[in-house]
Amino acid sequence: MAVQQNKKSPSKRGMHRSHDFLVNPPTAIEPTTGESHLRHHISPNGFYRGRKILKTKADE
């Protein structure tokens, strides 16, 4: 098991943790419906880049 040789100072500890933050995933707005969705994914109502790709239960 790895054990540290010396105590890490608060400054070094902060530098080590500097990339541990959470980031919101990038979202896009569907131009036809105005809904937000993950980029490069189909929106919840079946549209992708302004075109209807997938039939949904609401369509039937």
From Swiss-Prot:
Molecular functions per Gene Ontology: structural constituent of ribosome
Compositionally biased spans, kind Basic residues: 49-60
Region of interest: Disordered: 1-60
Keyword Ribosomal protein: yes
Pfam families: Ribosomal_L32p
One GO CC term on file: large ribosomal subunit
UniProt cross-references to InterPro entries, sorted A to Z: Ribosomal_bL32, Ribosomal_bL32_bact, Ribosomal_zn-bd
Protein name: Large ribosomal subunit protein bL32
Gene responsible for this protein: rpmF
